[in-house]
């Protein structure tokens, strides 16, 4: 597989994160590739963390440019198992997908 989250390609039995409903979650992503990635989170809307702890608009997809490091934040208010993946189908099929558990 060509893509990974925390060194793990494809869906695993263990979620990237397991959080309780109501928790604030922050996920830092680093695009170490030469390609853009439309990172999409199911089940929640998030805000991109900007300079000086400011937050961007609500969204469910963030386009990350090559070499970009970004952090998203959201309140985990929707219990379930939620997919986080690159919205470019070839990238997701090549391993750029994981999941979050909200209990």
Question: Over which residues does each language-model region extend?
Answer:
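Edge beta-strand plus adjacent loop/short-helix module at the start
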Residues: 1-37, 43-55, 59, 63, ...
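Short, glycine/acidic-rich beta->alpha junctions
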Residues: 56, 78-81
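Short, hydrophobic beta-strand segments
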Residues: 72-78
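Extracytoplasmic/periplasmic copper-protein system
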Residues: 62-66, 94-103
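Generic structural microfeature
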Residues: 22-24, 81, 95
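A short, acidic, flexible beta-alpha connecting loop/helix-capping segment that sits on the rim
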Residues: 78, 88-92
């Amino acid at each position: 597989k060509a893509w990974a989250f925390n060194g793990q390609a494809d869906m695993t039995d263990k979620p990237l994160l397991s959080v309780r409903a109501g928790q604030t979650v922050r996920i830092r992503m680093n695009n170490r590739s030469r390609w853009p990635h439309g990172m999409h989170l199911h089940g929640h809307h998030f805000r991109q963390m900007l300079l000086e702890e400011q937050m961007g608009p609500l969204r469910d997809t963030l386009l990350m440019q090559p070499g970009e490091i970004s952090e998203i934040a959201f309140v985990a208010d929707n219990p379930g198992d939620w997919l986080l993946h690159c919205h470019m189908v070839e990238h997701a099929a090549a391993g750029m997908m994981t999941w979050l558990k909200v209990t």
